[in-house]
Amino acid sequence: VAYNPALIDEEAPLKSAGLSADLIDSVELENLANIYLWRYPDLNITILRPCNIVGPGVRNSISTLLGMERAPVLAGFSPMMQFIHIDDMADAIVLAYNKPQRGIFNVAPQDWVAYQHALKLCGCGRIPVPSIPPILPRMILRTLNLRSFPSYLMHFFKYPVVIDGRAFAREFGFTPRRPLKEIFRFYRENKKPV
């Protein structure tokens, strides 16, 4: 993760080293779909790689963090991140379904924000967690029982992962309708205690 290009395009391989079994499975599923994509050109296979999906009803780590009153941050790190509203992602899926176009496509808006600034815009206080030595943040998070900041995503909260969604936007005529301001307002108005 630390060596990602500034904008990750569809040619970049997915990385699963050191991640959870679920994320490793996701990478393997995409690899299998990719094999079929090239082995069987008659099949119409469209693979969508979204950025962080957030919004009402979304129950993933990043959505949980944005919804907290106080969220942990790794001291000295605030990577750039992208967010797409769940309704915009649903629109992207419908577009991909309605237009048979084979290939791999990143789905992301053309804006991004630093993680700690996103927390601030969502009305979250920040709990700084020391990032070195590497075992220390894991011990602190385990002690505080902060499941929303899982240790296997530690690198994700250190280094930027910004994907290039221009190919999908161009091919499918996709433009997200919900700006970051609207996404963050939802989290600011719907806080959950730690």
Would you name each region that the model predicts?
Residues 1-18:
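N-terminal Rossmann-like NAD(P)+-binding domain of SDR-like oxidoreductases, especially those catalyzing
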Residues 49-50, 54:
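Conserved SDR Rossmann-fold cofactor-binding beta-strand/turn motif
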Residues 25-29, 58-62, 74-97, 102-103:
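Substrate-positioning beta->alpha
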Residues 2-6, 57-62, 117-120:
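Short aromatic-enriched loop/helix-cap "lid" or pocket-rim segments at secondary-structure transitions
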Residues 90-152, 165, 181, 185-188, ...:
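Mid/C-terminal beta-alpha module of Rossmann-like enzyme folds, strongest
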Residues 2, 18-46:
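Active-site Tyr-X1-5-Lys
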Residues 60-83, 125-161:
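Alpha-helical membrane-targeting segments
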